[in-house]
Amino acid sequence: MSKATKRKHVVKEVLEDYVTPTEDQQIMRVLGSNGNNLHEAVTGSGERFLLSMPTKFRKNIWIKRGDFVIVDPIKEGGKVKGEISFILYRDHIQHLRKLGVWPEGFQEDRTSGERNEGTQKERSEEKEEEEGDSESEDDDSDLFVNTNRATVLYSESEEETDEDEEEDKGRA
């Protein structure tokens, strides 16, 4: 199987499959990446663990701080105590909440997240209104300037063109 085909199947599996954790598995929130495909995560009860990312997800699926994952425990692990088996996105989280499988420790984060989303929407609406006012003015000062190109100023004056025309007429 080529890399592109493998990536396609892994992404399709992560986005389309709805998985519920088994008795051994648990849902955890990623706190950050420690490098070498190790991620620090916390359970709903507040316990912190190091998790390893399996090779099928490496360079195919990205995990950032605050994402939720389903973890298979590693019983013989010293520092690394779990392996990520599934990455949860918004639709998966809503599905797990409907089933009543979502951990109680993460329930409170939902309400604070919704509050933050509401304030962010209000701020974005205010910014759009401010931008709407500035759009009526033709101000190009906020445009990106490419510093990798030399700035060339072209100045054409009518005097030069008149002189050129007179010289051309004199030659003819």
Swiss-Prot record:
GO cellular component, one term: nucleus
Family annotation (SUPFAM superfamilies): Nucleic acid-binding proteins
S1-like domain sequence ranges: 5-89
Keyword line: Nucleus, RNA-binding
SMART domains for this protein: eIF1a
InterPro entries: EIF1AD, NA-bd_OB-fold, RNA-binding_domain_S1_IF1, TIF_eIF-1A
Subcellular location: Nucleus
Comp. bias intervals (Acidic residues): 127-142, 156-172
Highest taxon of the lineage: Eukaryota
Disulfide bridge partners, by residue number: none
Region spans: Disordered: 107-172
UniProt GO MF annotations: RNA binding; translation initiation factor activity
Biased composition (Basic and acidic residues): 107-126
Gene3D superfamilies named among the record's database cross-references: Nucleic acid-binding proteins
Function description: May play a role into cellular response to oxidative stress. May decrease cell proliferation.
Entry-linked PANTHER family: RNA-BINDING PROTEIN EIF1AD-RELATED (PTHR21641:SF0), TRANSLATION INITIATION FACTOR-RELATED (PTHR21641)
Family recorded in the similarity comment: Belongs to the EIF1AD family.
Protein name: Probable RNA-binding protein EIF1AD
Organism: Danio rerio (Zebrafish)
